[in-house]
Swiss-Prot record:
PANTHER family: TRANSDUCIN-LIKE ENHANCER PROTEIN, TRANSDUCIN-LIKE ENHANCER PROTEIN 2
Species in which this protein is naturally found: Homo sapiens (Human)
Reported tissue expression: In all tissues examined, mostly in heart, brain, and muscle.
Subunit composition and interactions: Homooligomer and heterooligomer with other family members. Binds LEF1, TCF7, TCF7L1, TCF7L2, UTY, HES1 and HES5.
Record remark on domains: WD repeat Groucho/TLE family members are characterized by 5 regions, a glutamine-rich Q domain, a glycine/proline-rich GP domain, a central CcN domain, containing a nuclear localization signal, and a serine/proline-rich SP domain. The most highly conserved are the N-terminal Q domain and the C-terminal WD-repeat domain.
Compositionally biased region (Basic and acidic residues): 179-188
Protein name: Transducin-like enhancer protein 2
Length: 743
């Protein structure tokens, strides 16, 4: 279009100026440096604001805790004044008439304290502090604080805050130590959430409106009655008992106390069962195990099949019951989480574990740790009564009941629905094809035969059998009964060991390896150590902890140390020789419900109502592992000679975890909560019991069903003799059963 020899036209005055590449690079560099300077300035400003925010949060938390402390102190002083006034009223009549008038006038003058006098007193307290540090600016009073002493609360809070600042300035070099102390001391305060069991519900629920006053203890819900079964407590784990001649009022249990329990985190459908809480008592929020059964063994869950179990059974270990969905655990309360710090334990196993008597707030101000979570509203607790299921005959032969949803489950090559699944490291779940020797071989039982029935008379929450298999110990309400099972014939207890209080249930009893001592724990802060070698069994020592209840016990192989699972989530380590507490393992954020020892006494496994299983190193005094689940943990046991840990859950599943590899097995034969679990000493099999009245025997680790026995009520506890020849169970129909294992 244009000739190739065309000369370039000169630049006209109206054309834009052209930058060189170097100039453009310099311009970009200048702009980048400018933006970088702006970014640095904004970053410093952001860090400054974050620091100010942290400081304001610290001041707010300080004021928040002080307000609660002052409120408690106000009520305390009011109660003191009330009591002193009563004492004065009792003493004044003994004075002469003249002195009576003088004293009465003096008392009346003392009661007339004006607002001006209060302000003057507070001003006198503030005056010496004003020379050292200005008072901390205070935020408005949080909603929910009682305003009974509102006149001088803010001013007094300012005085305390100023005093705290002064203390911080004087003791600046100790701030780190005090802050650490604050974390150590405030960690136990999170136990306003978990709660211990208090008593067992023992009656049946009469038809009528009697059960309408039940309430729910949940950290996210306000107190008050609920209108429907689905809104009532989802902490349900129930066992039936014999019906009394006259059903008592549904408002109270026979002992007048609230129900106790390890909780189930699921709501009920088509069932009257629900759990009452015990927040009205001095104990923390009740999340408990109600030992009462549902009609027709209805699982305590809306996700489980609520139809009654079928009597028809299908022989063979490959039949299955239905799967229950795992219940998701609700998130913890924001308020309670914001005011607690984690606890680290690093002292050696033999070192005494000491805790101070007060907590510090950010190293500045001592505040009782109990003030932290007082925003949780107490709920008045009431007991509930339930209908019982029809009595089922004992079945010693292997049987597995059909399930209404079995057709939807994966199947094994034999064509029957599977109940055992292997879960790989990547979460893939596959049915387990059992090996040909799953149910045969040395040390594998064929079935169990009922040998003795021990009529304890109360719900049997704990059982153990002696090493000689001569005696069985059953724990119920307020006592442990000793039975001689070495002789045939009708059984009557040969001794009764009265423990705890008469109305408190025994939750665990453990024999020392020599069989000469028995340790008993339950719904009390005290553990009892019984001397069984004496002519008459007697208490030779008592161990007292700060927790209101003990859920489970374990004894070290050398019998020198005892471990107790407490309702506040702590694991207390006791020196049995000196009868002293030597350590506390703190990590569970809810009650610790079960415990076992592994690796020749060097590791401890605990399960909790916080949906976690934790492993502790007893030599180093620290937590090694933590396994999280979507269901509460009710029972566990470690295989004596293999690296497998069996866990029984509220969701009705039994999971077999490999403690060194990311693999596990899931077993789905139970139809409701798995309440107890025990390995045979050979490690080749174990048993589990549940609220579905079943005793299941499983092959380690893949869970082939060896045999299954049906009782007439929920089976709460179990034990296996040291020689693996006997199994003893405790149930909700006030009896224990001794089985002979047939090989």
């Amino acid at each position: 279009m244009y000739p190739q020899g065309r000369h370039p036209t000169p630049l006209q005055s109206g054309q834009p100026f052209k930058f060189s590449i170097l100039e453009i690079c310099d311009r970009i560099k200048e702009e980048f440096q400018f933006l970088q300077a702006q970014y640095h300035s904004l970053k410093l400003e952001c860090e400054k604001l974050a620091s100010e925010k942290t400081e304001m949060q610290r001041h707010y938390v300080m004021y928040y805790e002080m307000s609660y402390g002052l409120n408690i102190e106000m009520h305390k002083q009011a109660e003191i004044v009330k009591r002193l006034s009563g004492i004065c009223a009792q003493i004044i009549p003994f004075l002469t008439q003249e002195h009576q008038q003088q004293v009465l006038q003096a008392v009346e003058r003392a009661k007339q304290v004006t607002v001006g006098e209060l302000n003057s007193l507070i001003g006198q307290q503030l005056q010496p502090l004003s020379h050292h540090a200005p008072p901390v600016p205070l935020t408005p009073r949080p909603a929910g604080l009682v305003g009974g002493s509102a006149t001088g609360l803010l001013a007094l809070s300012g005085a305390l805050a100023a005093q705290a600042q002064l203390a911080a300035a004087v003791k600046e070099d100790r701030a780190g130590v005090e802050a650490e102390g604050s974390r150590v001391e405030r960690a136990p305060s999170r136990s306003a959430s978990p709660s211990p069991p208090e008593s067992l519900v023992e009656e049946e629920r009469p038809s009528g409106p009697g059960g309408g006053g039940k309430q729910r203890a949940d950290e996210k819900e306000p107190s008050g009655p609920y209108e429907s079964d689905e809104d009532k407590s989802d902490y349900n784990l129930v066992v039936d008992e014999d019906q009394p001649s006259e059903p008592p009022s549904p408002a109270t249990t026979p002992c007048g106390k609230v129900p106790i329990c390890i909780p189930a985190r699921r709501d009920l459908v088509d069932s009257p069962a629900s759990l009452a809480s015990s927040l009205g008592s001095p104990l923390p929020r009740a999340k408990e195990l109600i030992l009462n059964d549902l009609p027709a063994s209805t699982p305590a869950s809306k996700s489980c099949d609520s139809s009654p179990p079928q009597d028809a059974s299908t022989p063979g270990p490959s039949s299955a019951s239905h799967l229950c969905q795992l219940a998701a655990k609700p998130a913890p309360s924001t308020d309670s989480v914001a005011l607690r710090s984690p606890l680290t334990l690093s002292s050696p196993f033999t070192t005494s574990f000491s805790l101070g008597s007060h907590s510090t707030l950010n190293g500045d101000l001592s505040v009782p740790s109990s003030y932290v979570s007082l925003h949780l509203s107490p709920q008045v607790s009431s007991s509930v009564v339930y209908g019982r299921s029809p009595v089922m005959a004992f079945e010693s032969h292997p049987h597995l009941r059909g399930s209404s949803v079995s057709s939807s489950l994966p199947s094994i090559p034999g064509g029957k629905p599977a109940y055992s699944f292997h879960v790989s490291a990547d979460g893939q779940m596959q049915p387990v094809p059992f090996p040909s020797d799953a149910l045969v071989g040395a040390g594998i039982p064929r079935h169990a035969r009922q040998l003795h029935t021990l009529a304890h008379g109360e719900v049997v929450c704990a059982v153990t059998i002696s090493g000689s298999t001569q005696h069985v110990y059953t724990g119920g309400k307020g006592c442990v009964k000793v039975w001689d099972v070495g002789q045939p014939g009708a059984k009557t207890p040969v001794a009764q060991l009265d423990c705890l209080n008469r109305d408190n249930y025994i939750r665990s009893c453990k024999l020392l390896p020599d069989g000469r001592s028995l340790i008993v724990g339950g719904e009390a802060s005290t553990l009892s150590i019984w001397d069984l070698a004496a002519p008459t069994p007697r208490i030779k020592a008592e161990l007292t902890s700060s927790a209101p209840a003990c859920y489970a016990l374990a004894v070290s192989p050398d019998a020198k140390v005892c471990f107790s699972c407490c309702s506040d989530g702590n694991i207390v380590v006791w020196d049995l020789q000196n009868q002293t507490m030597v350590r506390q393992f703190q990590g569970h954020t809810d009650g610790a419900s079960c415990i076992d020892i592994s690796d020749y006494g060097t590791r401890l496994w605990t399960g909790g109502l916080d949906n976690t299983v934790r492993c502790w190193d007893l030599r180093e005094g620290r937590q090694l592992q933590q396994h999280d689940f979507s269901s509460q943990i009710f029972s566990l046991g470690h295989c004596p000679n293999q690296d497998w840990l069996a866990v029984g859950m509220e969701s009705s599943n039994v999971e077999i975890l490999h403690v060194r590899k990311p693999e596990k097995y899931q077993l789905h034969l139970h139809e409701s909560c798995v309440l107890s679990l025990k390995f045979a000493s050979c490690g080749r099999w174990f048993v589990s019991t549940g609220k579905d009245n079943l005793l299941n025997a499983w092959r380690t680790p893949y869970g082939a069903s060896i045999f299954q026995s049906k009782e007439s009520s929920s089976v709460l506890s179990c034990d296996i003799s040291r020689n693996n020849k006997y199994i003893v169970t405790g149930s909700g129909d006030k009896k224990a059963t001794v089985y002979e294992v047939v090989y």
